[in-house]
């Protein structure tokens, strides 16, 4: 039965009719809202598309109007050189007037590592007639070009503001070096990725290429060394790093096999850019291997890019490596066959030293901490349940210890940052196989007591009865890195001791009082026995400086002819004379970690015109 509603005017409605009307109105309203939303969205999208299209057109117009050559070059330079060039590269020239774009466009040029290396030899570049360095500032970045144009611009940093800004990133070639010179020779410069064009109207009698640094001849006192490998060190922190030891890894085996290096690396030297010798030490067990490890002590300014050199190739040289000078915090290689009382404390008499030979044929002496040996001979003076050595000095929590050791037994051996006998036994960052943890070595960090202990099991049987290099890096209270042979990396982030700790090595008597399911233990595995070849302590920060050997090939083309030379030496020039012509020539540097200098000589005085185009990332900000 339908229920009815009677209005004052006498109209009769049913509830069902009202519900249907309400549903109809709701559907209509929702449909209208959806339609309106879609219409507004479409309008906004159309507006955004038009805005982006306008910005794109403005950006393209900006680049097209400001390509090379700009408006301020010498007319002779333009008429006699650039008008003859058939430049295919997409260029952007800073020698233009950008005032018409003020408030509409701003651009930023980001310098790269190759620009910085080229800036290091700015004095040599500016030695060409009338050439000057012009610096452009983009926020915290600076970008330099070298030119004989004498106009300085203040409108390169165009101002722009607002919310609706659109950013475009463009890869373009910028005229990095431009100029003219009259004479019988010219020095041209470029770095990785650069294209060099030059014009000469006289006969070229000689032309050569060489990599360059900011010092014309830093090796005047090293003339008996045939090779010099550049090494770039970058301080990644905004702080000074003084007397900081950096690790340099190189393949001495390949150098030795090719007759370029002594078999014992005795001719290896490290020098700074001025040719001054640097303190260094080479891990002797890595000599004549593909993974030769050298440590060099350097001073680094905040965020500094430092270039040093590894010299080699002198068959009559003998080593000057010195661990004590390289690692002022601590170093010992036990080569004298005694324990230095100024470095170590120990609890036994008659330390056992053993002479041995590495696989590379180099002799060495190591200290043996064999508990059974010292106990059977009654050599232990005190603390008779172990034999140990501990450094007299303690080291703050931003240091690293590195040692070459052999863990012979499966139980009761310790090595690393470990508190002395008068301190808390649980304050430590060590490599250990203390028997409660089972038969495997462990990377362990603990503090205060047994309830605050973190460890990582190193389940590798090769770690026993074989020599390995271990490193423990303490990054304050943040973390501890455990590294084996520069290949296995483990990190612990909890239960880290933040106080000073000595360096200690322990070989303990097996503890029968606690079993933990690992008992019985074979008799020949019960007492600790660890051998130590060498050990040192150095400063440690994170991130560490980046070290790059710039020993790659230098590859460039001269008028299409490819030159490929190994960058083993900065001494040797490369003859490129046969492939140069009278007129316009093109050189493309395809790969080079250092700037390259090209010396061109003619048979008479003549006009030289030259251009170096450098690939760069340019961000163009547009306000449509």
From Swiss-Prot:
It is found in: Membrane. It comes from the Archaea. Its main location: membrane. Signal peptide: none annotated. The chain crosses the membrane at residues 10-30. Keywords: Membrane, Transmembrane, Transmembrane helix. SUPFAM superfamilies: Concanavalin A-like lectins/glucanases (SSF49899). Pfam families: DUF2341. GO terms for cellular component: membrane. This is Uncharacterized protein MJ1470. It comes from Methanocaldococcus jannaschii (strain ATCC 43067 / DSM 2661 / JAL-1 / JCM 10045 / NBRC 100440) (Methanococcus jannaschii).
């Amino acid at each position: 039965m339908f229920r009815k509603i009677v209005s004052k005017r006498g109209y009769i409605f049913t509830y069902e009719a009202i519900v249907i009307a309400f549903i109809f109105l709701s559907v209509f309203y929702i449909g209208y809202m959806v339609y309106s939303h879609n219409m507004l969205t479409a309008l906004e999208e159309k507006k955004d598309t038009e805005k982006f299209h306008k910005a794109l057109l403005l950006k393209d117009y900006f680049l097209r109007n400001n390509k090379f050559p700009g408006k301020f070059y010498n007319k002779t330079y333009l008429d006699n050189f650039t008008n003859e060039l058939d430049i295919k590269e997409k260029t952007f020239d800073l020698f233009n007037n950008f005032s018409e774009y003020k408030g509409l466009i701003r651009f930023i040029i980001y310098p790269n590592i190759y620009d910085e290396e080229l800036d290091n030899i700015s004095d040599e570049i500016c030695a060409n007639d009338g050439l000057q360095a012009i610096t452009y500032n983009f926020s915290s970045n600076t970008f330099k070009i070298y030119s004989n144009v004498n106009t300085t611009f203040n409108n390169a940093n165009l101002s722009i503001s607002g919310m609706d800004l659109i950013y475009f990133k463009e890869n373009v070639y910028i005229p990095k070096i431009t100029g003219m010179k009259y004479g019988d020779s010219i020095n041209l410069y470029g770095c990785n990725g650069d294209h060099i064009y030059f014009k000469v109207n006289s006969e070229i009698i000689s032309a050569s290429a060489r990599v360059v640094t900011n010092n014309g001849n830093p090796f005047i006192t090293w003339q008996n060394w045939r090779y010099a490998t550049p090494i770039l060190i970058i301080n990644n922190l905004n702080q000074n790093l003084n007397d900081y030891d950096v690790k340099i890894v190189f393949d001495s085996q390949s150098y030795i096999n090719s007759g370029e290096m002594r078999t014992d690396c005795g001719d290896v030297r490290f020098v700074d850019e001025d040719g001054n010798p640097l303190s260094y030490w080479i891990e002797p067990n890595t000599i004549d291997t593909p993974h030769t490890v050298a440590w060099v002590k350097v001073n680094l300014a905040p965020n500094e890019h430092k270039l040093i050199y590894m010299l080699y190739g002198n068959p009559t040289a003998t080593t000057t490596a010195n661990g004590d000078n390289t690692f002022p915090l601590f170093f010992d290689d036990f080569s004298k066959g005694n324990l230095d009382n100024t470095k170590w404390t120990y609890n036994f008499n008659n330390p056992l030293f053993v002479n041995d030979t590495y696989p590379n044929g180099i002799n060495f002496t190591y200290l043996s901490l064999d508990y059974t040996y010292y106990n059977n001979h009654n050599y232990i003076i005190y603390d008779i349940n172990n034999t140990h050595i501990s450094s007299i000095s303690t080291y703050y929590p931003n240091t690293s210890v590195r040692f070459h050791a052999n863990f012979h037994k499966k139980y009761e051996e310790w090595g690393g940052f470990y508190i002395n006998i008068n301190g808390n036994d649980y304050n430590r960052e060590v490599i250990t196989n203390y028997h409660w943890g089972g038969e495997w070595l462990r990377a362990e960090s603990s503090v205060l007591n047994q309830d605050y202990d973190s460890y990582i099991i190193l389940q590798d049987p090769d770690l026993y009865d074989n020599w390995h290099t271990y490193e423990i890096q303490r990054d304050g209270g943040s973390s501890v890195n455990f590294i084996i042979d520069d290949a296995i990396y483990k990190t612990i982030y909890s239960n880290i001791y933040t106080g000073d700790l000595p360096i200690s090595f322990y070989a303990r008597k097996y503890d029968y009082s606690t079993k933990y399911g690992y008992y019985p233990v074979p008799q020949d595995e019960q007492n600790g026995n660890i051998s130590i070849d060498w050990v040192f302590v150095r400063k440690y920060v994170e991130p560490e400086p980046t070290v790059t050997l710039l020993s790659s090939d230098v590859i460039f083309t001269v008028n299409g002819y490819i030159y490929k030379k190994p960058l083993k030496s900065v001494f040797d020039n490369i003859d490129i004379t046969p492939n140069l012509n009278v007129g316009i020539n093109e050189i493309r540097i395809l790969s080079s970690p250092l700037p390259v200098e090209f010396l061109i000589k003619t048979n008479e005085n003549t006009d030289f015109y030259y251009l170096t185009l450098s690939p760069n990332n340019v961000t163009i900000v547009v306000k449509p």
